[in-house]
Amino acid sequence: MMGVPSEAELADYMQRAINEGADPELVKKMAGGKTGIVATLKTDKPGKTVAFRFDMDCNDVEEERCDEHRPAKEGFASEHKKAMHACGQDGHVTIGLSAAKLLAANKARLAGTVKLIFQPAEEGVRGAFAMMNAGVVDDVDYLFGGHIGFKATTDNCLVTMTDGFLATTKLDAEFTGVSAHAGAAPEQGKNALLA
């Protein structure tokens, strides 16, 4: 799998989860970085398989601790260094769990199968690639995904469609320059990033 931390890091994360109250048996199932979860609701009526994807990774970002930062001010900032839900993943998980509750409550009114895919490692499509290779979407007829990222100007719901926001493109670039002392002789350098 792409982007999985080292065995030592995984062991530390797993122990931390147990120390913070996670069920040790569930944590064991996540060995090797397998943290994705798929919930499947099979109705009693035939029909298509519809899946909804909710990414749930955290980013390798240090969360701000100052009082002006709303999560710090209100007490819901990340407790762990370099592990921040900077792109709304906690919101995505909340939406997914709420959808699960609503779908289960309305199962008799539904047809076919519904899959709720809680996907790790959204950044760089690593998690999607691993889950696809594991066969999670092989039987899916329709797949919906979303991402928190726009600010509504009213209290109404905001839904957008786009060709670029929910996509990823990778580019390898190599920059070559000449280093120089920034204070003593900056004119001797060639900053390739400014070129």
Model-derived segments and spans:
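Histidine/acidic-residue-rich, glycine-tolerant segments that coordinate divalent metal ions
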Residues: 77-81, 90-91, 103, 108-195
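Acidic/His- and Gly-rich active-site-bordering loop/insert found
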Residues: 1-85, 94-98, 102, 109-110
